[in-house]
Amino acid sequence: MAGLQSLWTDNKSNNRITSGVAGVLGDMLADAGVAKKLYNDGWLPRMVSILQYEECRDCALEALSRFVGHNFPDICKDVSTNHFQKISQVFFDVDTDTEDSAQAVRIMAKALMPTLGSIETPKLITIFDRNKIKIKKILDRLMEKLENPLPPHSPTSTCHEIDLAIGLAYLSPDLVLSTLRYLQCFVACLRSSCMKVRAKGTRIIYDLCVGRAGRPKPNNMQQIANAWMKGYPPEIDTLIRDYGEDRCHASEGINGLTAFQEVVADRTIDLDFYKFGLAIGQAMLETDYAVFKLPFERRSSKYPFNTWLDALPHTANVLRSNAEFDKADIIEAKYLMVTGKWMAAKDLAEKASKRSPKIGFWYYAMCIPMEDADSLRTAQKGLRCPGLSLYVRHGLLYQASTRAWELALKALTGPSPSDQLWSQGLAYLGLCYQNLKTILTISPPDSVGIASLANLFVLAHILLHGPELSPNLEESKPIVEKARLITKLNDLIWAEELASAPIASQMAREIILKHLVSVSESRSAFIQHTDSCAWAEQERGDDAKQPTTEEVSKLFEGASISSSSEDPKRSKYKFFGTERQEIHLYQCSWCHNPSAVLRKCGVCGQACYCDQQCQKLHWKEHKTVCKSPEISK
């Protein structure tokens, strides 16, 4: 090391020697431990400093590529925040079809993507602005590179070009959303035969729309009722009649208010909180509109309540004193949810679920404030409970499908297809797709969050099918039309608010459908790039299998499929880079939650479970196959 240091210091102006030093460093940097030491000794900025000299550039780029290739967070952050501008200048100075161009892109992409996860985006945007990094110029150059025929060098360059374009899009969302050329590039990803490319294109479009629109907010009863009383246009009336007007959310809310008023009228006379609790405790399992803020007309020092909603904690205590523990906990949990105390509701429901594990409401209350993976697992457990009301089933399916969507996008845009997380991501995506299909079949068209889910189903459908979709998307028209109608109904409900807060999944759906047909031809060269990129080759490995929709769907029967009385005929799509048995290995045998950390049955070694509770709930069914006289520990 000291010899290289001396050689560099004594010959800074001799490009032939500095180039030789850079070449030696490039070989040494193959070792991660040595790379870390060389970085600490200050060699990274030295390599950047000689990029301006053409005779040194090849070796310097190779050394920098090795530096970032080890994915050390501090090295990637250093390159992104201090040296990105000079590396991007190389990208501008050389022809796009050269190896130097590919190396510059690789360095920027490998440095930027990890940095996006370690620095808050607004802070990184400020750093890029301060360093005068020309994001638009880089993106335009990338588009030029991706639109040309595939160059002869390594196909990994396409992967890095896509990653760099995505990373820069996060730093310039307004620019990307307003520039047709960039949007079409990301939409064209959805025509690729490579699942990872499709997932990356879908995720960046969806994330940009979430940033612009914000997360979806649920409808409230007042807005639904107001829109219902004003009346709907003919095509929306048809949508509602086809489902059943008396089964829709508006009717449910109005009927719930009427029923609650009748209960309150009786209990205002006798103040029998036990009877009040029995009535609304059952109603809370059936509808989201079981209790309203009606005035409590007999307020006193003993009953200091302004509304009947305020009386719910007291009602729960009265029920407990009469050994009605389940209804008491339902009422208190619902009160905590209505008042925004989600974690307290979760904790209460978690304790109650140990006493009565087959009440689906507990899992609904628990899953809302949880992180994605825990929420999905909990929702899937709830969907296995018997006798679920449509209200609870809808809530569980909403959480399960949206959380599975987020987890699928994360898993399918990160690891290699040989990684366990990749198989888990495919399972998440399949589960999301089936749950969305189910909820759109069973739920009213004006139900909570349904517009977001209808548009999300279109995104999941396109992500799954990709290049198999016909050029004019003919087979997709029924689900697209349903999403359009439900979205129009949602627009009528949220008439004023939507002017400033559109639905993210709707924005993404409109962007994708606007360009998906045309990019098949206009971006054919880019699509060919993606079909032969390194990710695609990994997915098409010698040991890779391509399960059909029917095979993958079998993995999720019981949780989502059984939530519907009918199981519609499924179309075919392909998952690349995994085997059916490999997906099954990461799925709970009871609740069907995808996970890479499961406990196996100690007897047969085939069944896998999230935890002991799932194992116990599955035992009655599993013991006939397992042949064990008692549950394994």
PLM region descriptions:
Residues 1, 34-41, 73-82, 120-140, ...:
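Short, hydrophobic/charged alpha-helical patches characteristic of ARM/HEAT alpha-solenoid repeats
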Residues 1-8, 43-49, 83-91, 131-147, ...:
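Buried hydrophobic core positions in alpha-solenoid tandem helical repeats
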Residues 3-6, 21, 147-151, 185, ...:
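Short alpha-helical interaction motifs and adjacent low-complexity tails used for partner binding
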Residues 6, 16-33, 49, 58-73, ...:
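Alpha-helical solenoid repeat architecture
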Residues 58, 62, 102-120, 155-163, ...:
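Amphipathic alpha-helical repeat scaffolds of TPR domains
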